[in-house]
Amino acid sequence: NVQDPETGRLSYGGLLSPHTNKLKGMGRPPVDGAPRSCDTLNGNCVLIPHRVAERVGNLDGIFTHKMGDMDYGYRCVQAGASLCATGVYVGTCERHGEPDPWRRPGATLRERYRALIGPKGLPVREWKEFCRRYAGPWWVLYWLAPYVKALALPRG
C-alpha cells in the first residue's frame, strides 16, 4: 500500500473483488496494520516471488496503464499465488488524476470521449481484452457500457 503524500490517504495497493464477475464492485482492504488477502492489485510497490514471476511472466504488453496491474494480479492468482496487502503504508505516491475523468460534470462530448479512450481511461482494445478475460460470459456488455454511458451523459 502506498499513500498520497498530500492527503495521507491510500493511493494504490491491493484490490478486492467480492463478486464472481471481477469487474464489479472493486474495493480496497483497510490499512489497519494487519495484512489482508487481495484478489488483484493496483500497485506502485509490489514484491513478486521469483517462482511466481517465472510462472506468470511479466506484465502483458497489451495493457499500457492500470489494467496491466490488475491483469497481472489476476494472472498471479490464476497461477496459484496468493496476494496480500501489507496493512501498512510502505511508501508514498500521488494519486494520478481524478478517477474516471470521462464522468466529469460539464465536460463536452469530445472531452469525455478523449478521456475515456486515453491511456488513463479505458482504451478500446485494452478494455475489450480485459473484459474478455475477466467479465464472464456477458463481457461484451461490460466492454460497451462505459462508452455508451460516457457518450449518453448530458452536458452540464
Q: Over which residues does each language-model region extend?
A:
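Short beta-strand-to-loop element that shapes/binds the nucleotide-sugar donor at the catalytic cleft/hinge
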Residues: N1-L16
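Residue-level signal for pocket-adjacent positions within structured domains
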Residues: S11, G33-R36, E54, N58
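Short, hinge-like loop/turn segments at secondary-structure boundaries
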Residues: G13-H19, P101-R104
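NAD(P)-dependent short-chain dehydrogenase/reductase
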Residues: L15-K24, D39
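A recurrent flexible, glycine/aromatic-enriched loop bordering the glycosyltransferase active site
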Residues: M26-I48, R112-L116
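A short, conserved alpha-helix in the catalytic core of glycosyltransferases
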Residues: T40-L41, V46-G57, I62-Y89
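Active-site-adjacent helix/loop segment of glycosyltransferases
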Residues: Y74-R155
